[in-house]
Amino acid sequence: MGNRTEEDYNFVFKVVLIGESGVGKTNLLSRFTRNEFSHDSRTTIGVEFSTRTVMLGTAAIKAQIWDTAGLERYRAITSAYYRGAVGALLVFDLTKHQTYAVVERWLKELYDHAEATIVVMLVGNKSDLHQAREVPTEEARMFAENNGLLFLETSALDSTNVELAFETVLKEIFTKVSKQRQNSTRTNAIALGSAQAGQEPGAGQKRACCISL
């Protein structure tokens, strides 16, 4: 997956980062978009987003990654935060089981606010802290499989799987979008074919136009 200038792109995909405060969402964002890591552990206040344009085949995708704090007092922003999102990384801290124990609640909140077709990846962050692990890989992987989620373990500190996590989500979104466009094109072709087969041309052409919008 290659880089491209921010002004030159074919699609914009909004991806949200969700999960408890302190799991490393902000550092995943900064590692992916700016290749930076901050050891300052202050909690993110409010909402921020960063962008990075990447190539998927011949298509330029502008990934708009949104980040917010996981504290209860900021939950009032959820509707606007999730609006328009086509992808989500649900992040927990591998070294703190309590952050994993609430991923189901975060998943419910996501589905309450976002489209049902949103692509979701469960991300176990801080994989570099091997000795402090509290969440077994297979336990998290099984939860992801049972809930139809993608799954990866990452380390924003040493960059392990950060690129792969975002790339996998973006590819899955792009695949869905491509299929929708193909289905729309196929539907238009059928409508136009019906018009040519004997329907009133004006009506058939109008129907195809409406379907494609």
Curated annotation (Swiss-Prot):
Reaction(s) this enzyme catalyzes, per UniProt: GTP + H2O = GDP + phosphate + H(+)
Family matches, as SUPFAM superfamilies: P-loop containing nucleoside triphosphate hydrolases
Compartmental location: Cell membrane; Cell projection, Pseudopodium membrane; Cytoplasmic vesicle
GO MF terms held by the record: G protein activity; GTP binding; GTPase activity
Residues that hold GTP according to the record: 21, 24-27, 38-39, 43-44, 70, 125-126, 128, 156-157
PANTHER family: DRAB11-RELATED (PTHR47979)
Subunit structure: Interacts (GTP-bound form) with RAB11FIP1, RAB11FIP2, RAB11FIP3 and RAB11FIP4. Interacts (via the hypervariable C-terminal region) with ITGB1 (via the cytoplasmic region); the interaction is GTP-dependent. Interacts with ITGAV. Associates with the integrin alpha-V/beta-1 heterodimer. Interacts with VPS33B.
Name of the protein described by the UniProt record: Ras-related protein Rab-25
